[in-house]
């Protein structure tokens, strides 16, 4: 799993995010903390992960479909290798659910 360079800050961010979701303030918090480009990058990363997990499309085709760099696809692919299979199944299930809504 990815280890943040500053675990205390990362843990505080995660806890603040958890509270925001519990209070229905997640949109406001993420808008406050992330620039439009950063929000777009997160959305792109989610699409990359979903397509990589689907395993129906080669990485080069994902790159072309999403109009992104090979390095961006590779970073997503490398992170998949670090995560547990159970978690990746959870991600696959939930990315499929959000695509179908």
From Swiss-Prot:
InterPro entries, per the entry: Trp_repress, Trp_repress_bac, Trp_repressor/repl_initiator, TrpR-like_sf
Record GO terms (molecular function): DNA-binding transcription factor activity; sequence-specific DNA binding
A cellular component annotation (GO) from this entry: cytoplasm
Keyword Magnesium included in the entry's annotation: no
Domain of life: Bacteria
Chief localisation class: cytoplasm
GO biological process, one term: negative regulation of DNA-templated transcription
Function description: This protein is an aporepressor. When complexed with L-tryptophan it binds the operator region of the trp operon and prevents the initiation of transcription.
Recorded family membership: Belongs to the TrpR family.
Protein name per UniProt: Trp operon repressor homolog
Organism annotation: Mannheimia succiniciproducens (strain KCTC 0769BP / MBEL55E)
Source lineage: Bacteria, Pseudomonadati, Pseudomonadota, Gammaproteobacteria, Pasteurellales
